[in-house]
Amino acid sequence: MSEEEREVLRPIIERDAISWAVAKVDQQMIDKINILKASILAMHKALDQLRQPPQYILVDGNRFKKYKRIPHQCVIQGDAKFASIAAASVLAKTHRDEYMKGLHEYFPFYNWKQNKGYPTEEHRHQITLHGICDHHRKSFRLLPDEGQPLLFQEDAMISSNSHS
C-alpha cells in the first residue's frame, strides 16, 4: 500500500473505528529492552488507551505477551488477512511517518521526511557526515563494517585510550 493510500485511509479509520489508539516507545527504551519487547510494550500501551477494551486481540506477527486476561492470536502477515490488523497497521505507519516528518524539521540533513528513519544509503551517508543524534537507536547498527560514527573528537580519544 502506498503512502498516499494510507493517508487517505487514516481519517476514515480514525472516524469509523469502534475504538483506536496509537502508542509510542522512545528509542532509549528500545535500546534498553530490544525492538521486539518495545513493540509489545507499545501494543500494550495502545490497548490501555482504548475507550472500549477488546474481547479478543489479533496481533500481526508471531510474538505477543498476554495482555490482562484477554485472549489473543498472533497471525503472520495478519495485515493481509484481517481488516482490523490492516487498519491498525495503517494507523501505526501513518502516525510514525508523521512523527518522522516532524523530526525532519529539526534534523533536515537526515532527510527523515523521505526515508522515515529507515537506513537508506542516503541516510547512512548523512550519519557519516553528521553523526547520530538522540533520536537514533544506539542498538541499531546503521553503519555495518564501519562501526558507529563518533559524535565528538573526545570520543575518539576515549575509544583509542581504552584499547591500549
What are these regions (language model features)?
Residues 1-164:
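RNase H-like, Mg2+-dependent phosphodiesterase core
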